[in-house]
């Protein structure tokens, strides 16, 4: 009796667990899309804050990040100074309203960018090296003042070193011999070159600053300057301004820092001393090499590499780490864009709580049917660039990677939701799982259309026409991110970032790794990343510091963040610190796999103790090569120039969906097995059995566009698990595998077109449910095509939603197992109703949906509400001279930061272009085993 009861209970629980395992993950707050929320002039009020937040919440957004910027012309009286008591009251109200609506608030630790403002005195402002040189013959004294040549710097520049270099190679430090600007020194015999190094100021002001945020950019290399800067926030949040009413305001969920754009900041006070402490020799004794122009010697390149490494360490320790620790003390976390920094990007990304990458421009994958626009710019952030942030998160064990999403995909007012999908899919396969739109602007109800706007943005706001159907897009993001935030990363390889090669090879002194120049900074590394990806593998980058702390467990390399990898790959690095190579040797001896592609490292970076370090390096390299030459079982070091053949010798299995089917994907692991996000970022359709790199007993497919799921078809062939997959160009899917369990769930509907498709040609009824400016005299019946080609008033200028209606006859809907509605070319999104019932919102190619359950025998009524872009309306306003560019500072700039209007734009196609077809479907049987 008891035994039977236990068996029955086990069966019940197993069935229950299976039902739970196959469901969609719960969509948490962080899985919902977030957005940068610009406060223009911080001219906010409670009524409009509530209005804005309610619109965002209703559409499905989760987090709003407040970034105050410049204000609106003629609105100065309503501007609220940043961090003033009134500003803190508005923040407090915003946090309260967000909580009421189930949202959360992040905020920029400043206004505009980069960090700076009125509290940054000149002593804490960003610094720049200035050099003045003098010539002096032996026996003479200098009758010139030791001073900076740049007149603007005279009030600020401080002498750091005065060094004398003779023609015979002598070097003297004369700094202590300068009194009141005059050198008290008689030159010994010979010809002398005197170099005076001054710590001056960049005088850069905060870019796009808000009221109360204007001022100098701070010195990110100075611990004192950063501490002083953060002190202003503590006083504001603790309510310590003397006229603060209402007490302390809660710290935000996250503090944010935008990309590092501290231009020309190549120095800091005390840098000579920091350099000596960190690099082991005096930089000032090598100023002739450090300042040398033209062709550089190896010595010069090594010294400059050491200088670049020192700047990176100062930024990491004095800014990134201090800022993050400060936020933690106040119960907040940090979100940071490290790109643009002068250091090894992996380390600052890994230091913060949420590393953030940035897309800038539009990617073109050749997706079939996707609209093209001439007014775009190519995306500077490919997969290789986006992976810096996710790599930092993965190797450090951080759960989220965020993204500044959709920065300047197209010219303003011309970006469709369909154009957004490929680039967000690219971010997903690159490791992003917490997207932030760039962005949306607080806009009061009384602001005339288009409302308050920020340049360089997709404008994901309620005043944009794409907002009408954006909730469907937001649902897509939330569904994807619910999976992408689940489990842990499962990338195959760690790939060594050869930053010392970059530091040594690149010209100039200050080297900033911004996204727009990475193709020039690291062409070899970028090529290697794409070759590894094309070979079917996925990877995270690793820095020297993280290699130093990596361990070997069960023949896998485990980072300090707890993430395991099957091998560490060194792609063509010429320079490597001796201790890092030694650590790779130790890992290999412990059973971990290390792969050298193209070449073994050849030398150590840096200048100090060069020969001793070279000796250590060469001894270690000989041992590494000895392991690489070993044959047979137990080999742990591999070398090769053929990426595919060499990587195939590791324990990692390539994903055939990448190598054979041109699909993009990312794989994560979970307690039941693995899950993939897969996107057809290609012009080809896919319908095939696809081998997986992981074993599975069963699997589920999930469609993030509509929430449909079902049990996938699997088979075992040639020792591999294969899944049957159907993906059209531009489509995406989520696949979840179960290693041990055969889950019980309805089967995924694999469908193919049957004969008997019907094209709904002829005339359609057209009426506008929304239009601005309002349209008049719309024809009762129209052929499919752009409504801008029609002759009614406002056809070429309106922004709105046109409802297309037609009827069609299907005598026996049951004659097919399902029916597919294909809308063809849609400009730009569509809501579908059949027989008065809502069917779907279609916002991306292919514009298709299943409609079988909505059909009835005989006559059926089809309604399609199509919403266009605001481009035609804004162009008309420019032609009529309507003043809507009412913002201070840069106001509204066109692509490339150019001034101009949209008056010359041709009408952008709008409406339902078709062809529209009803296609009978048959569900294929599982006969392909």
Feature locations, PLM:
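Short beta-strand segments within Ig-like beta-sandwich modules, predominantly Fibronectin type-III
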Residues: 714-716, 839-843
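Mature N-terminal segment immediately following signal peptide/propeptide cleavage
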Residues: 20-63
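An acidic-aromatic loop/edge-strand motif
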Residues: 112-122, 128-129, 134-161, 165-170, ...
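Aromatic-lined ligand-binding clefts that engage carbohydrates, nucleic acids, or primary amines
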Residues: 691, 808-835, 843, 862-866
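Bacterial Sec-dependent N-terminal signal peptides
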Residues: 1-21
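Acidic/aromatic-lined carbohydrate-recognition and catalytic surfaces
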Residues: 69-177, 185-187, 191-194, 198, ...
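Extended acidic/polar, glycine-enriched regions
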Residues: 154-155, 161-238, 716-751, 755-756, ...
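Carbohydrate-binding surfaces of carbohydrate-active enzymes
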Residues: 34, 45, 49-50, 63, ...
């Amino acid at each position: 009796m008891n035994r039977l009861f236990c068996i029955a209970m086990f069966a019940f629980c197993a069935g229950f667990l299976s039902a739970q395992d196959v469901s969609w993950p719960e969509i948490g707050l962080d899985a919902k899309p977030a957005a940068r929320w610009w406060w223009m002039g911080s001219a906010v009020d409670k009524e409009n804050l509530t209005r804005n937040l309610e619109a965002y919440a209703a559409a499905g957004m989760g987090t709003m990040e407040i970034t105050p910027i410049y204000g609106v012309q003629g609105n100065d009286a309503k501007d609220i100074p940043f961090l003033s008591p009134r500003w803190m009251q508005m923040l407090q109200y915003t946090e309260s309203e967000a909580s009421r609506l189930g949202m959360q608030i992040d905020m920029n630790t400043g206004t505009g960018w980069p960090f700076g403002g009125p509290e940054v005195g000149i002593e804490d402002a960003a610094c720049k090296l200035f050099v003045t040189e003098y010539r002096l013959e032996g026996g003479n004294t200098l009758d010139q003042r030791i001073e900076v040549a740049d007149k603007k710097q005279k009030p600020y520049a401080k002498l750091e070193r005065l060094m004398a270099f003779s023609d015979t190679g002598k070097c003297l430090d004369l700094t202590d011999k300068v009194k009141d600007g005059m050198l008290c020194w008689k030159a010994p015999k010979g010809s002398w070159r005197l170099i005076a190094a001054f710590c001056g100021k960049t005088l850069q002001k905060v870019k796009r600053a808000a009221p109360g945020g204007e001022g100098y950019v701070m010195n990110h290399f100075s611990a004192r300057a950063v501490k002083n800067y953060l002190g202003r926030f503590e006083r504001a949040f603790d309510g310590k301004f003397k006229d603060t009413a209402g007490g302390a305001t809660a710290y935000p969920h996250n503090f944010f820092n935008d990309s590092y754009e501290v231009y020309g900041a190549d120095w800091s006070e005390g840098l000579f001393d920091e350099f000596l402490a960190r690099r082991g020799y005096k930089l000032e004794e090598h100023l002739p090499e450090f300042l040398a122009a033209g062709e550089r010697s190896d010595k010069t390149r090594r010294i400059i590499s050491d200088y670049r490494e020192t700047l990176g360490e100062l930024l990491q320790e004095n800014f990134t780490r201090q800022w993050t620790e400060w936020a933690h003390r106040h119960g907040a976390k940090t979100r940071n864009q490290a790109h643009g920094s002068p250091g090894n990007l992996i380390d600052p990304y890994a230091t913060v709580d949420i590393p953030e990458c940035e897309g800038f421009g539009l990617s073109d994958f050749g997706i079939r049917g996707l609209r093209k626009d001439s007014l775009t710019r190519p995306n500077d952030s490919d997969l290789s660039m986006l992976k810096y942030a996710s790599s930092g998160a993965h190797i450090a064990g951080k759960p989220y990677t965020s993204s500044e999403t959709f920065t300047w995909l197209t010219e303003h007012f011309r970006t469709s939701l369909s154009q957004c999908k490929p680039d967000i899919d690219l971010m997903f396969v690159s490791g992003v799982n917490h997207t932030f739109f760039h962005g949306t602007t607080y806009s009061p109800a009384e602001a005339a259309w288009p409302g308050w706007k920020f340049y360089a943005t997709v404008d994901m706001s309620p005043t944009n026409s794409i907002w009408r159907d954006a909730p469907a897009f937001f649902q897509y993001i939330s569904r994807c991110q619910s999976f992408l935030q689940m489990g842990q990363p499962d990338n195959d390889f760690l790939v060594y970032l050869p930053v010392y090669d970059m530091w040594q090879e690149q010209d100039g002194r200050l080297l900033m790794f911004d996204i727009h120049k990475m193709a020039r900074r690291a062409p070899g590394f970028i090529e290697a990343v794409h070759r590894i990806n094309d070979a079917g593998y996925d990877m995270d980058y690793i820095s020297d510091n993280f290699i130093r702390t990596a361990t070997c467990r069960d023949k896998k390399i485990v980072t300090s963040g707890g993430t395991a990898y099957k091998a560490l790959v060194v792609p063509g690095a010429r320079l490597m610190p001796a201790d890092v190579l030694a650590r790779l040797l130790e890992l290999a001896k412990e059973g971990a796999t290390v792969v050298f592609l193209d070449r073994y490292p050849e030398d150590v970076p840096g200048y100090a103790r060069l020969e001793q370090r070279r000796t250590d390096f060469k001894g270690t390299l000989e041992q590494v090569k000895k392991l690489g030459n070993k044959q047979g079982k137990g080999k742990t070091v591999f070398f090769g120039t053929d990426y595919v053949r060499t990587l195939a010798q590791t324990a990692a299995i390539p994903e055939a969906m990448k190598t054979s089917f041109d699909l993009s994907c990312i794989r994560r692991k979970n307690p039941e097995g693995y899950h993939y996000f897969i996107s057809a970022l290609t012009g080809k359709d896919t319908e095939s059995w696809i081998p997986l790199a992981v074993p599975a007993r069963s699997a589920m497919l999930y469609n993030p566009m509509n929430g449909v799921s079902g049990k996938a078809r699997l088979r075992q062939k040639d020792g591999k698990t294969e899944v049957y997959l159907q993906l059209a160009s531009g489509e995406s899917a989520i696949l979840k595998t179960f290693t041990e369990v055969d889950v019980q769930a309805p089967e995924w509907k694999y469908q193919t077109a049957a004969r008997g498709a019907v094209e709904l040609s002829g005339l359609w009824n057209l009426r506008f449910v929304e239009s601005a400016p309002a349209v008049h005299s719309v024809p009762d019946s129209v052929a499919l095509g752009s409504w801008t080609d029609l002759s009614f008033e406002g056809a070429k200028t309106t922004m709105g939603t046109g409802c297309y209606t037609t009827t069609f006859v299907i005598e026996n809907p049951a004659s097919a197992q399902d029916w597919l509605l294909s809308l063809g070319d849609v400009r730009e999104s569509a809501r579908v109703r059949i027989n008065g019932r809502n069917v779907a919102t279609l916002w991306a190619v292919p514009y298709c949906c299943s409609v079988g359950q909505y059909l009835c025998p005989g006559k059926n009524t089809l309604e399609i509400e199509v919403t266009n872009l605001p481009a035609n309306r804004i162009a008309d306003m420019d032609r009529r001279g309507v003043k809507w560019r009412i913002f201070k500072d840069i106001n509204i700039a066109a692509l490339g930061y150019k001034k101009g209007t949209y008056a010359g734009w041709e009408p952008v196609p709008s409406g339902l272009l078709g062809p529209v077809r009803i296609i009978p479907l048959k569900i294929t049987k599982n006969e392909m085993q």
